[in-house]
Amino acid sequence: MACGATLKRTLDFDPLLSPASPKRRRCAPLSAPTSAAASPSSAAAATAASFSAAAASPQKYLRMEPSPFGDVSSRLTTEQILYNIKQEYKRMQKRRHLETSFQQTDPCCTSDAQPHAFLLSGPASPGTPSATSSPLKKEQPLFTLRQVGMICERLLKEREEKVREEYEEILNTKLAEQYDAFVKFTHDQIMRRYGEQPASYVS
């Protein structure tokens, strides 16, 4: 006659009152013991696989970094551009004043300096006196100060965009050269180390 006894679990193993999970832990599978030194064929296959993966995905090696010009703002503000234009205009006026005073004090150089004064002031109209007779006359400006500032700002932006494009092109070229050198170096190392060994079924 067979009899069986049932054991009642204590509260520690009750799934409702136990803080731990009621599920049993799975046994971790025993890993097969690996040899201390791998066979040359397997090492060659692993190296060849890594080489093929690197050669097949150049974009992974040449990952596109964010452009260093992305967070760079314009160094010159509109107010600074206008201030520089004003200072340059004052220097030009002072230079013209010095040239006219030099011509008045030294009459022998008047004939030599006449073409230069003609270029600065432009040809005189028939109804007005010549530029040499009235060098300090007020000229009619072609552009306002704000218009000149807008022109200079636009030229600076165009120049900045051109420099940015040249930098990106040079950077991509250098990265491509580095990648080609990396591929060639890896291929030479594989051929030097495993080139003379016979091919196995793994490769």
Swiss-Prot record:
Stretch forming the signal peptide: none
Gene Ontology cellular component list: chromatin; cytoplasm; membrane; nucleus
An example Gene Ontology molecular-function term: transcription coregulator activity
Motif (SYVS motif): 200-203
GO biological process: adaptive immune response; cerebral cortex development; defense response to bacterium; innate immune response; nuclear protein quality control by the ubiquitin-proteasome system; positive regulation of adaptive immune response; positive regulation of innate immune response; positive regulation of interleukin-6 production
Listed transmembrane segments: none
Compartments where located: Nucleus; Cytoplasm; Membrane
Residue ranges of the motif Nuclear localization signal: 22-27
Quaternary structure, from the entry: Homodimer. Interacts with IPO9; the interaction is direct. Associates with 20S and 26S proteasomes. Interacts with SMARCD1; promoting SWI/SNF complex recruitment. Interacts with NFKBIZ. Interacts with YWHAB.
Function text: Molecular adapter that acts as a bridge between a variety of multiprotein complexes, and which is involved in embryonic development, immunity, myogenesis and brain development. Plays a key role in nuclear protein degradation by promoting import of proteasomes into the nucleus: directly binds to fully assembled 20S proteasomes at one end and to nuclear import receptor IPO9 at the other end, bridging them together and mediating the import of pre-assembled proteasome complexes through the nuclear pore.
Protein family membership: Belongs to the akirin family.
Name of this protein: Akirin-2
Species assigned in the record: Sus scrofa
Lineage of origin: Eukaryota, Metazoa, Chordata, Craniata, Vertebrata
Name of the encoding gene: AKIRIN2
